[in-house]
Regions:
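Short, well-structured N-terminal submotif of metal-dependent ribonuclease cores
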Residues: 1-36, 45-61, 129-130
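Acidic, PIN/NYN-like endoribonuclease modules and their adjacent C-terminal/linker elements
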Residues: 1-3, 98, 102-130
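General small-molecule cofactor/ligand-binding pocket signal
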Residues: 35, 66, 124-126
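Alpha-helix capping/helix-boundary segments
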Residues: 10-11, 40, 72, 96-97, ...
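A general structural signal for well-ordered alpha-helical segments in protein cores
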Residues: 21-22, 41, 53-56, 73-76, ...
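Generic structural signal for small/hydrophobic residues in well-ordered secondary structure
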Residues: 7-8, 44, 76, 101
């Protein structure tokens, strides 16, 4: 199994042809098949444009998709409560993705690190060249 969980933004950039992201995904495959949350699958498929369906479906067929189960939901709720107590709002989708990473010991691959102010998370160092 791959050690990486792809956030929705990474998947979208890849599917829209951002070569730097595609190269990064090729590099990550050396460690196994990356995964994504079922939530990311939903988010990406909601935004699919006409003509992108086949490529999108093919991409998801080659990822491990992690379900949002009871443990993931409970851990996400705990993260939201903990951060609310610190005056920080965590969005439900981000908390679910973060809890998936924490529970499965995965490294999150995202351009949106600011969405995940969670000390327990490990991030893959993603950069975009101008």
């Amino acid at each position: 199994m791959g050690r990486f969980l792809l956030d929705s933004d990474i998947i979208i950039w890849h599917l829209r042809g951002r070569e730097e992201v595609t190269e990064m995904l090729r590099d990550l495959q050396r460690f196994g098949v990356p995964g994504c949350s079922a939530l990311s699958l939903l988010e990406v498929q909601l935004g699919v444009k006409k003509g992108e369906e086949e490529r999108t479906n093919y991409f998801f067929e080659h990822l491990r998709v992690f379900d949002v189960n009871r443990q993931v939901a409970s851990r996400a709720a705990q993260l939201i409560r903990e951060h609310k107590g610190k005056g920080v709002t965590l969005d439900i989708p981000d908390a679910l993705i973060a809890s998936t990473c924490i529970l499965h010991d995965l490294i999150l691959v995202t351009f949106n690190r600011k969405h995940y102010p969670i000390k327990e998370l490990n991030f893959y160092p993603v950069t975009i060249r101008s």
